[in-house]
């Protein structure tokens, strides 16, 4: 008989082991056996909880996107009366949260983006994440700008966030957060009306 609460513990172990494996050897070379060994479980446990490697990648990305959502929402909830500029900076901060810019998370995101072009479930998950970012940005810009301008500014800031993140991920170096925040702050102030 399985122990109560073990499923969530096992899932967490396996997701963490997947992130470690992706970080060290990449998604393509990370095998179910390696991930199971890192998690200290049998390969059958992975099949039981996730079906296969793709199911494990999907669960890992759901976990990372959930952390992203929480990082953004926690910052926004701290600013209920915040200005559009403050709330836009909060969204930027959530996207550059440590849960999103650690080496393991960055490599997992890259593997996820590549896999999403070929796997419908991962594609849907990627689209939800992308739309959520754009919707949040446009909504905040729209507090100060007409709809069309808000959409353009939101799209531009989303591209800047993704571009800064991607450049850091591909460089193999940590994201330069002060520079990223400076560039995004400049973009935001250039697009919001001045008082």
UniProtKB/Swiss-Prot annotation:
Annotated DNA-binding residue span(s): 31-50
PROSITE patterns: HTH_TETR_1, HTH_TETR_2
Signal peptide per UniProt: none
Molecular function GO terms recorded: DNA-binding transcription factor activity; transcription cis-regulatory region binding
GO biological process: glycine betaine biosynthetic process from choline; negative regulation of DNA-templated transcription
Role, per record: Repressor involved in the biosynthesis of the osmoprotectant glycine betaine. It represses transcription of the choline transporter BetT and the genes of BetAB involved in the synthesis of glycine betaine.
PANTHER family tied to this protein: HTH-TYPE TRANSCRIPTIONAL REGULATOR BETI (PTHR30055:SF234), HTH-TYPE TRANSCRIPTIONAL REGULATOR RUTR (PTHR30055)
Name assigned to this protein: HTH-type transcriptional regulator BetI
Organism: Escherichia coli (strain SMS-3-5 / SECEC)
């Amino acid at each position: 008989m399985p122990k109560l609460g073990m499923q969530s513990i096992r899932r967490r172990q396996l997701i963490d082991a997947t992130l470690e494996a992706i970080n060290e050897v990449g998604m393509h070379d990370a095998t179910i056996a390696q991930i199971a060994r890192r998690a200290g479980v049998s390969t059958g446990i992975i099949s039981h909880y996730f079906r296969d490697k793709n199911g494990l990648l999907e669960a890992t990305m759901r976990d990372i996107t959930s952390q992203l959502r929480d990082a953004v929402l926690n910052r926004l909830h701290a600013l209920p009366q915040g200005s559009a500029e403050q709330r836009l900076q909060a969204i930027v901060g959530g996207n550059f949260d440590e849960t999103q810019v650690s080496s393991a998370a960055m490599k997992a995101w890259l593997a996820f983006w590549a896999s999403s072009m070929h796997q419908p479930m991962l594609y849907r998950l990627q689209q939800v994440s992308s739309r959520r970012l754009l919707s949040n940005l446009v909504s905040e810009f729209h507090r100060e700008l007409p709809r069309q301008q808000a959409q353009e500014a939101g799209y531009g800031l989303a591209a800047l966030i993704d571009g800064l993140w991607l450049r850091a991920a591909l460089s193999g170096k940590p994201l330069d957060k002060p520079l990223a925040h400076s560039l995004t702050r400049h973009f935001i102030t250039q697009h919001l009306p001045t008082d």
